[in-house]
Amino acid sequence: MADVDVDVPSAAPVLDGAMDINTALQEVLKKSLIADGLVHGIHQACKALDKRQAVLCILAESFDEPNYKKLVTALCNEHQIPLIRVDSHKKLGEWSGLCKIDKEGKPRKVCGCSVVVIKDFGEETPALDVVKDHLRQNS
């Protein structure tokens, strides 16, 4: 029984070290949703960006309104807010909690989301460190 307790903590850092940006971003979005620091949708996101309340902005590339993309990008550039782009608005909606979870834990009825703004990261996690490292490398 003591061996099991020793193995579990040693396995956790290996998973965190191999964490890619998408997995880390998904965990950071969950933690900020729990901390009530997440804003969904173009209107609310633009208000948070303009008031400089945002810490991080995530924009979906599959969103088909180019003027909104330009607006969000311009607001992020103007206020020096980091911007991460993801490929699918359905994936972004799933990550930010805009879906139903069935009995098996799989997402159903996923609602797409064009942009998500994080106002509060919540608690510090290794996933947050991965996201911050990614932002430092790409800036």
Swiss-Prot record:
> Major location, coarse class?
nucleus
PANTHER family given in the database record: 40S RIBOSOMAL PROTEIN S12
Q: Which family does it belong to?
A: Belongs to the eukaryotic ribosomal protein eS12 family.
Q: Mutating residue 97 to D has which effect? A: Moderately delays development and reduces lifespan. In wing imaginal disks, increases its transcript level
What is the name attached to this protein's record? Answer: Small ribosomal subunit protein eS12
**GO MF annotation, one:** structural constituent of ribosome
Listed under GO biological process in this entry are: cytoplasmic translation; maintenance of translational fidelity; positive regulation of canonical Wnt signaling pathway; ribosomal small subunit biogenesis
Function per UniProt:
Subunit of the 40S ribosomal complex. Part of the small subunit (SSU) processome, first precursor of the small eukaryotic ribosomal subunit. During the assembly of the SSU processome in the nucleolus, many ribosome biogenesis factors, an RNA chaperone and ribosomal proteins associate with the nascent pre-rRNA and work in concert to generate RNA folding, modifications, rearrangements and cleavage as well as targeted degradation of pre-ribosomal RNA by the RNA exosome.
Q: Which GO terms describe its cellular component?
A: cytosolic ribosome; cytosolic small ribosomal subunit; nucleolus; small ribosomal subunit; small-subunit processome
Q: Which UniProt keywords apply?
A: Nucleus, Ribonucleoprotein, Ribosomal protein
